[in-house]
Amino acid sequence: EDIRWAVPRIKQILKAMNVPVLQVDGYEADDVIGTIAHKAEKEGFEVYMATPDKDYGQLVTEHVFMYRPRHTGGFEKLGPQEVCEKYGLQNQLQVIDLLGLMGDSSDNIPGCKGVGEKTAIQLLQQFGSIDNLLASTDQLKGALQRKVQEQVEEIRFSRFLATIKTDVPIEFDAQSLIYQERDWEQLAPLYRELEFNSLLKQAPTLVANSQVSSKSTKKAKPQEATLDLFA
């Protein structure tokens, strides 16, 4: 609920920061990013996707990379070779099947209960894909065979959830994505209203010191300020 009320404010701030907002109704943000990344690559750009999410590994190519934060600080750059080495895969598209088997709680992908990363990697190394695995469950033994056979639909659904679309109906306009300076005339009042005081310190002095009466105005009209959240 909280994030739903915050979205309009987030968009206001991004607009004032001159950060483009790309969205398509009915599609996840991952799908929009996947589509834009591949369209940009086709136009000759080298693309970096800043994300910790494993599922983005399926999108990497020779010119599309993951820029993944490390737990110890800093970032790692992952291309096809790095993704395959990291997860013991033959090609980066196997990331989809890997997550379909092991799941990913951060992305609400259930996977096959009782199958962890190590087992999922072993299964993909042996069978190559979920389809081949499900067609060859007679080659499995004991508890593992039972787990896979009893969760066929869950595995297929998890693979669907792990798949990032790259055909979202959205145009790639490179010019509209060029970096622009923040519009402090719009941004400073928003920071002040939301009491983002540490961020407000980044504003140029004249802007930061202007409209000093904004707090008293906000206190005088609390209802108006609240209604803004529902715009």
Residue spans of the language-model regions?
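Extended two-metal-dependent nuclease catalytic cores across DNA- and RNA-processing enzymes
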Residues: 1-171
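Low-complexity, acidic/Ser/Thr- and charged residue-rich accessory regions of DNA metabolism proteins
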Residues: 150, 160-231
